[in-house]
Amino acid sequence: KLNKITIDDYRDVFDFPVQNYYRKLGFDFGKEAFKSSGLDFIKIYENRKFEPQLFNDTLITLNTLKQSGCTHSVLSAQNIVTLKKSVSYYQLDEMFDYISGLEDHYAIGKVDQGKKLIKNLNFKLDEVAMIGDTEHDHEVAEAMGIKCFLMDRGHNSTQRLQSKNTDVYSSFSTL
């Protein structure tokens, strides 16, 4: 049995691939396979996936950027079917030119997806930026050859994000 963790604990240990995060929490994959634990999580997640709300400044920021000529894409380690359902649920379909997710539920990472996405975009690398909330997002942006802005109100703590020596923001308005 694992101990309960706080949001701060979560943000201090969450990692990609997600299997590494499970290990940090104390999972013993010799006793229970990662795929089994991962599917258990997905069952719970599926029942609660629409409980979170968008941050108050999300829609205004997306709309302002879109009106100024910026395009938006989603790059996620989430399963593509679930990701598209979430985008639709939050009525964001018209905001994004590309929605890129994984074919499975195991969140191994998104470097390969990012490289594929950047090839689909009709922009120079210095015209593209990633906004993310994990150290992995920074690594993906580096692999893609683009600028990364990190938000400290997501999966990783401010301290972890600052360790990447990049810009870290607490809201879209400060971005």
Residue ranges and their predicted role:
Residues 1-56:
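N-terminal helical cap/lid subdomain that shapes the substrate entry/recognition surface
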Residues 3, 28, 93-97, 124, ...:
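Conserved H-loop
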Residues 9-13, 93-108:
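A short, structured active-site edge motif that brings together acidic residues
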Residues 46-74, 80-87, 111:
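Short, acidic loop-to-helix structural element flanking the phosphoryl-transfer center
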Residues 59-66, 118, 138-142:
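Surface-exposed amphipathic alpha-helices with a cationic face
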Residues 90-102, 160-175:
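Structural recognition of alpha->loop->beta junctions
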Residues 110-139:
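Conserved Lys-Pro-Asp/Glu-containing loop-to-beta segment of HAD-superfamily phosphomonoesterases
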Residues 129-170:
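Acidic, Mg2+-coordinating phosphoryl-transfer loop and its flanking beta/alpha structural elements
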